[in-house]
Amino acid sequence: MQPPSLLLLVLGLLAAPAAALVRIPLHKFTSVRRTMTELGGPVEDLIAKGPISKYAQGAPAVTGGPIPEMLRNYMDAQYYGEIGIGTPPQCFTVVFDTGSSNLWVPSIHCKLLDIACWIHHKYNSGKSSTYVKNGTSFDIHYGSGSLSGYLSQDTVSVPCKSALSGLAGIKVERQTFGEATKQPGITFIAAKFDGILGMAYPRISVNNVLPVFDNLMQQKLVEKNIFSFYLNRDPNAQPGGELMLGGTDSKYYKGPLSYLNVTRKAYWQVHMEQVDVGSSLTLCKGGCEAIVDTGTSLIVGPVDEVRELQKAIGAVPLIQGEYMIPCEKVSTLPDVTLKLGGKLYKLSSEDYTLKVSQGGKTICLSGFMGMDIPPPGGPLWILGDVFIGCYYTVFDRDQNRVGLAQATRL
């Protein structure tokens, strides 16, 4: 006969829900900025107040106080995946964004004049058996306007319909999220995604809503409280990458992971020692702070420093806030090397230039953009998809650190 303590342990393990390892395929689409540029749209109007506004302040004020401009306009977001909300799941395409902390999707009750709502999937609480009314209003400020609506609670499925896709999935119960009834400007009309799933820390969550990954952690749905991103740099590859919840996949990276401690638990913020452009220019002298952000496609830094960087790589400004590099010169340009945790992370000219179509022609754009982020949130560098595409990135909530390793070219 088994000892009672061992029997209880076995029964406990059988009764406990199995911690999952969840893979979410990511798909790469043309960004809003590129879509508007190719159509000849007024992109400069969208970026007049800065291409990114979510870093304007360090954290939102308490409920009832003024909420700062926490989220950017997502003009440069490119990688999206699918989740489900409700029972049965209603599917939505979302940006998995490590630079914000809230989940929101369009609501079936959106305003009549909200054109973006017409052309995206909408959440219908009346079709969900697990919906719980909340009703608290929420308001997220953007450079181009204000996204608003009200909070609701329901089950979130990741991915949306895992049984049909053959993927392992999890259900995060009792998740509070935003039903957007008003979306600002024209940004979301051109967007290929329905909503945003924020994966940063609770500190920057609007209305102090518990983020999806924190709720997932509390419900012990994954073995390790980590998630990792692989972004495929091949523009024609599908899927465009993979988000893994609960672990890492060594097929996506070479060598060991090197870890950086999070310096401030709001965004995924780390210390960066310096940035070298070839052997002729050093930026971030004496060290600086950087955000690792899956929701931004570019690498962003202080305006004056990035202006020097653009000059050093021969990039010239375009009216839409982008910089162009002559494609024939790309192979001759210097490496840009970021020093993080005492290790060097090199970006070749092929890594930091983006080939895009404009007016039927291929042009090359710089993967860097200048923006000054004021205190208390800034100054900051933002390491977006240009960097993450080169370095497989692990976000570790158990030990509050970010892991990096050279990404595999598949």
Curated annotation (Swiss-Prot):
Its main location: other. GO terms for biological process: autophagosome assembly; insulin catabolic process; insulin receptor recycling; proteolysis. Disulfide bonds join 91-160, 110-117, 284-288, 327-364. It catalyses: Specificity similar to, but narrower than, that of pepsin A. Does not cleave the 4-Gln-|-His-5 bond in B chain of insulin. Glycans are attached at residues 134, 261. Residues 1-18 form the signal peptide. PANTHER family: BETA-SITE APP-CLEAVING ENZYME, ISOFORM A-RELATED (PTHR47966), CATHEPSIN D (PTHR47966:SF42). This is Cathepsin D. It comes from Canis lupus familiaris (Dog). The lineage of its organism: Eukaryota, Metazoa, Chordata, Craniata, Vertebrata.
